Every structure is written in structure tokens, then in C-alpha cells.
From Swiss-Prot:
It holds the Pfam family Anticodon_2. It comes from Clostridioides difficile (strain 630). Coiled coil: none annotated. InterPro entries: aa-tRNA-synth_I_cd-bd (IPR045462), aa-tRNA-synth_I_codon-bd_sub2 (IPR020751), aa_tRNA-synth_I_cd-bd_sf (IPR008925), Glu-tRNA-ligase_bac/mito (IPR004527), Glu/Gln-tRNA-synth (IPR000924), Glu/Gln-tRNA-synth_Ib_cat-dom (IPR020058), GluQ/Sye (IPR049940), GluRS_core (IPR033910). Its EC number is 6.1.1.17. ATP binds at K261. The gene is gltX. The lineage of its organism: Bacteria, Bacillati, Bacillota, Clostridia, Peptostreptococcales. This is Glutamate--tRNA ligase. GO terms for cellular component: cytoplasm. Monomer. GO terms for molecular function: ATP binding; glutamate-tRNA ligase activity; tRNA binding; zinc ion binding.
Amino acid sequence: MNVRVRFAPSPTGFVHIGSLRTALYNYLFAKKMGGEYILRVEDTDQSRLVEGAIENMLNAMKWAGVNHSEGVILDDSGKVVQKGEYGPYIQSQRLDIYQEYIKQLLDSGKAYYCFCTKERLDEVRDAQRAAGETAKYDGHCKNLSKEEVEANIKAGIPYVIRLRLPENHTIKFTDLVRGDMEFNTNDLDDQVLMKTDGFPTYHFAVVVDDYLMKITHVIRGEEWVSSTPKHVYLYEAFGWEAPVFVHLPNILNKEKKKLSKRQGDVAVEDFKKKGYLPEGLVNYVALVGWSPEDNQELFTMEELEKAFSVERVSKSGGVFDTEKLNWVNQHYIKDGDDAYLTDLAIPFLIEDGFITEEEATNKYDFLKSMISVLKEKLQYVKEVTEHASIFFGDKIEVETEEGREFLRLEHIPTLIDALREKIEKTEVLNAEFVQAMLKEIQKEYKIKGKNLFMGSRIILTGQMHGPDLPKVMEVLGKETCLNRIAYVKNNIL
């Protein structure tokens, strides 16, 4: 079997983190099976379309490294184009195809015209709910004669086309995550297949498209489980073989409720704007609902491609833990290329007023050295603005009363003079020099431990804790270190 899977989002706005995971699992499954991964755009609900959403979605997938070679793609100029032999890959461009297949269902009696108004449908559903029944279509138009249908159409009465489900019919399918599943048509609705505007519903278009595009495995969210029996019956109605279904568990918040925008960051763009690395986000998202055979937690994309299997996808929802995401992402920042991270950090530093756009160029080497020191503390790149202040300016601000009290200790004036004297004498101030210098001060002035190391840190940075001090001082340079020592002596002591 030539495995073919698809990610088929609707261009309705931001790319939810759950959509990224669905795309990722489809991509990984295709890679594992040596198959094809397709991206199709499902835009049949024209009322919900957002301008630019297709471009945003494609850019998000490109950023994440979840790449496809068939379907809707961005060319080198950033233009949306389509590539592949089963197109069009945008549903609104396939309306003639859907008309052809809806006609087949009407001719075979597997679908029917429904002329019920919205008001009537609302009344029926309200009455059913009041009686404690499941709200669904009551079949009012199910048995209209051919003459009645033709007369209504000729009179211009708006209509939809519904799937004609047989009574008391058992629909079975196997889900690779949930196992064998069984539904009775008495519990299902005669689903609308074609809307009054001539556009197909999701339920109709997805079946036609998956069949014509030779999709072998449908990997999607668990919210579609209840619709799957209707899709399976549509395959039966056409005489087609249904694909294999894989329904992924929901991504949950810490309260075990479905993750939504009301609870904070849920869009890929939200995480990108904070400076999460694509490698970190993809690595973590892969683990929300899937577990590897061993306890490995850090995966490159290549490692995920080899390790992933749908058999190890969980039935129950996976909790999105931001702290765990931060831990994973921090690993990739620590190992990240300094220049790459600096380029990501510069917009945040400009936005918070640390540097100008001109300084981003003129002081690039300085910024790169700063990032090299700070990256071990960063969970995401935007956090650079919380730690960068120690690298800017000749004056320091002691942030806490505890720090100010420390500078009142008896040995501090001696330490200040010792630091100044030794730094003045050196021509090269680097981390190795600072380490040797502190050992000399310890030996010569009998200033030890916390008194030496924390005292030096407060004098040079204003902070009691922070990145490796010798590395910080190397980035600051001789002149800035001397200016800060003088400022503390003349203005703070």
C-alpha cells in the first residue's frame, strides 16, 4: 500500500497548537511509512474565512519544519500555489466535482432534497429537546415525490441536500487508537451534504476529496469521531473502500479541559512571537498525546520520524504543560547557534529600548557575546529582556535591599579597590583573567566565598545572582567594568 495522508485545515485564522500536532502526526506517519503527506485547504464554510489565513498557515508549517511536497504550498516568492496530480487542493475550486458526486447520490436514492426552513428546523429541535430526545432532523422531506421536488425547485424554494441514512443500520469501523467502533443509524442525523449556497458541507467534501486523492489513512482530532459513521456510510453509498481512521486525543489545559484561546497562548504564532524555537515546540507537541517506547524526551525531527507510531498514541487527552515546554525549549536554546539566537533576540531588545536598530548592526558582536552568556538562562528568546540589563550602561542599580545591605559590609571598600587595581593593570580582560584575578584577591586580601564572589557580582552588575560572572565581565569589557566600580564607590557606598 502506498500510504497517503493529509492535513486539511480551514483558513479561519490562527494555527492552533492542536492543528500543528495533527499536521505533525500526519507528517511523521507518512515519513515512517515511506508515504506521501499532502496539505489540502478546506474552505467550504465561506462565512468563516479570514484573509491571509492560508499564507499564515503555510508559513507556520514551514517555520515548524512540517513540510509537504503536494497540495497547497508557498513558492519561493511567497505566493500560494498548488502542486500535485490530484488537484485542485482548495475545496472552493472543486465545486463542479462535488456537483458530479452529489448527483450520483441523488440518482441512487442515497441523498434527498430538503426544503425545510430554518424556523421549522429550530421548532423541531426545540420540541425534541423539550421531550428529552436527541435533537436531529425528523425526515420531513425524506419521502417527497419526484414531482413535489421538481415543483419546489421550479418555485425557487431554497433547499439543501441530505444524506439518506437507512433505519436501524449498523455502521462499523476500526480506529487505530480507539479500536473497533460501532454505531446505529437510528442514533444519527440525516446529515446535510450540500448547502443552499451550492457549497458542500465538510462531511461530504472530505469523503469525496479523500477518495479522489487516494488518502489511505485519516489522522485527525477526536472531535470527528461522532461524524465518522456518517463518513463511513458515505463510502458505502458510493461503493468505495473507506480509509483507515486515527482519531487523536484532545490537547487539554491543566484543568483537563480542552485547550482554548481564552486560557492564553494556543496559536503557533503566539509561541513564535515569544521566541520559542521551532525545534523545541515541535519536540514538545509531539509528546502531548504520544509516548515513545523508552523514556527519551528530547527528539530531533529525524529521530521523531523514526520513533513515531500511531500504536503509541494515547486514547485520553494530553495536558499541555507550559513548564515542560519551557524545559524542552531551553535545551534547544542552550545548544543553539549564537548568531541564530542573536538574530531572534534583536527585535525584543529593540522593542524594550536596550538598543536602536543602528546599534543592532554596529554592536552585533557585543550582542552575540551577550547572548552566548545568557542563553543558558533562557526558556524562550523573549526572556532575554529580563536578563539583559546587566550588560548595558556604566551605572548599576542594586535591585534589592539585601544587595544594598551586602555593599555595607566591612570588606566591600577593600574589594572595590582590589578589583579596580587589578583590572586597570590588565590589557586583556577575559573570563580566564577574571577567574585568576578572583583567586589572587582571595589569597592576597583573605576575602573568601560569598564575600568575594557575591560581592564582586553586586559591584559589577547590581545583582546577587546571575550568569557566570567571569563571562559577563568579558562581555562588558575593561572600560565598562572600571566605570561601574567607580560608580559604586562614588555613588552607592
